[in-house]
Amino acid sequence: MKAKLLVLLCALSATDADTICIGYHANNSTDTVDTVLEKNVTVTHSVNLLEDSHNGKLCRLKGIAPLQLGKCSIAGWILGNPECESLVSKKSWSYIAETPNSENGTCYPGYFADYEELREQLSSVSSFERFEIFPKERSWPKHNVTRGVTASCSHKGKSSFYRNLLWLTEKNGSYPNLSKSYVNNKEKEVLVLWGVHHPSNIEDQKTIYRKENAYVSVVSSNYNRRFTPEIAERPKVRGQAGRINYYWTLLEPGDTIIFEANGNLIAPWHAFALNRGFGSGIITSNASMDECDTKCQTPQGAINSSLPFQNIHPVTIGECPKYVRSTKLRMVTGLRNIPSIQSRGLFGAIAGFIEGGWTGMIDGWYGYHHQNEQGSGYAADQKSTQNAINGITNKVNSVIEKMNTQFTAVGKEFDELEKRMENLNKKVDDGFLDIWTYNAELLVLLENERTLDFHDSNVKNLYEKVKSQLKNNAKEIGNGCFEFYHKCNNECMESVKNGTYDYPKYSEESKLNREKIDGVKLESMGVYQILAIYSTVASSLVLLVSLGAISFWMCSNGSLQCRICI
C-alpha cells in the first residue's frame, strides 16, 4: 500500500521537462493600421504612405527658380504693364507663381479675350524668347508711336503704356491705312498679342485716328477676325471711359500673320517664341520665396517626399505624390503587436494558438524559446524572417511604384461666362478624386489584411516544421510549445531550430519515458480504485455501528420495543 501511495505522489508532483516554443516578435510600438476587418490594429512595424507636411515656401524646382510675379498678374506680365517692368528680363523658369489678388494686370481697362486659355497655354511654357516682331522705330513710319500713352498705365509718376504693345496714333493730321505681316521663322510657336481701342466718344475717335469709321483685321492660317471699334459712353475705370480689348494667337512655324487697319490698332511690339516644358505650371499662392530646392511644389509650400500620396493640395507642380482626401494611409510591414501578459507566464497561447509576442526576441520576427538543464534563451529564425522581410519590402515597393505616378496637376481656368462648365469640371474632378481616395484606402486595407495573414501563416509553418521533426518524441502542450520526452541539451535544441533534428537518436529514450509516464498513469488509476473501495467499506461500517448504537439506546429506555420471533 505504501508503494502505491508513493507512485501516486510521483505522478502528481511537477517534472522539469525540456521545452521548446515557437513565437513571434513584439515591441513597444504604438503604430496602428486599419484592415478590411479591423480598425486600429497595433503592429510592430509599419510605413506611412501619406505625406501631410510642407515647408510653407516657394522653392526652386530641380535647381531652377520660379517666375514669381509678385504684384503682377499673368496679363500684366505678358502685356508688359509698366509696373511689371522687372519681369521683362525673365527668360526661363521652373513654374510661375501668381498671388491671389494681383494689383497690376491690364492697366488700361478692357476685356482680355480667351484669357483663361492663354493661362493654360503659358502653364506649359518653361522659357521663351522675347523679340521685336515689329520694331518700333522702323515698322510704322507713317504713324506716331510715342504719343500713345495714358495716365492709367503710369510709371514713376508719368504716363506710359505696355512694354509689349504700341498704341499707334495719327501723324501729321492723318492715319493712313496700314498693312504689316510677319513670317514665323523661329521654328517654334510664337505668341502674338495685340489690342483694339474703343473710344468713349466720336471726338476722341477723330482726334486720335482722324476718321469716324475704322476697322482692324488680323489673319493667319488658323486665325481670321475683323474688328470694328464700338464707340460708346462707359463708366470710368482707372480714370478711363474708353476700353482696349486684348487678343492673342499662336503662330505656327512657317505661318504668316497679317495686320490691316485704318485706325484703332494697338499693334504688337514684342512677341514670344515659346519653349514648352512638361514640368512647368502656374500656381496661385501667397507663400514667399525661399532659398530652397524641391521636386514638388504646391500653393501651400514645397513637398520633399518619396511617398505615393499627399493630402496637402490638389494643385501640384513637379514630381509630386498623388493627392487624396485621406487622413491616414499606413501600411503594415511587421506583425500584430501583442506582448505576452506577464501574469500568464512566459508562453502565452498569433496564428490562433499563441497569445502574445516576445519582447525578448529582438533579432527577428519569428523564432524559438527553449528551456533545458543548461538554461533558457531566445533565438530568431533568420531564414523565415528574412524571407518575410524580402516579400513585404518588395510588396511595399511595388505598391509605391504603382501608385506613385508623379505628375503636375494644375488648376483649370474658366471665365465668368463659363460657370456651368466650371461647376461641371469641379464635379468631375471631385469624382475622380473620390475614386482615387477610395482606391488608395482600399489598397492599403487589403494589403494590411494580407500582410497580417502572411505573418500568421509563417508562424504556423514554423510550428508545423518543428512538429514534423519531433513527431512523438515530444508532446504538444497547447500554447505553441512542445515538451520533450527526452533530455534535449543546447546542441539538440539547435538541431531542432535548424531542421537537422535526429529523430531516431532520441526515439528509444522518448519511448521509454512515454511508457513510464503511461505506466504511472495506469498505477495511479489502480490506487484510486483501491482507495475508493476502502472508503466505501469504511463508510458502510461506520453507518452500521451508528445505527446499532442508536437502536440499543432506544430499547434500553423504552422508546423502542424489540421482539425477536423464531
From Swiss-Prot:
Belongs to the influenza viruses hemagglutinin family. A lipid is attached at residues 555, 562, 565 (S-palmitoyl cysteine). The record marks 344-345 as: Cleavage. The lineage of its organism: Viruses, Riboviria, Orthornavirae, Negarnaviricota, Polyploviricotina. It comes from Influenza A virus (strain A/Leningrad/1/1954 H1N1). Residues 1-17 form the signal peptide. The gene is HA. Its main location: virion. Disulfide bonds join 21-481, 59-292, 72-84, 107-153, 296-320, 488-492. This is Hemagglutinin. It is found in: Virion membrane; Host apical cell membrane. GO terms for biological process: clathrin-dependent endocytosis of virus by host cell; fusion of virus membrane with host endosome membrane; fusion of virus membrane with host plasma membrane; viral budding from plasma membrane; virion attachment to host cell. Residues 551-566 are cytoplasmic. It is a single-pass type I membrane protein. It holds the Pfam family Hemagglutinin. GO terms for molecular function: host cell surface receptor binding. It comes from the Viruses. Homotrimer of disulfide-linked HA1-HA2. Interacts with human CACNA1C. Major glycoprotein, comprises over 80% of the envelope proteins present in virus particle. Glycans are attached at residues 27-28, 40, 104, 144, 172, 177, 286, 304, 498.
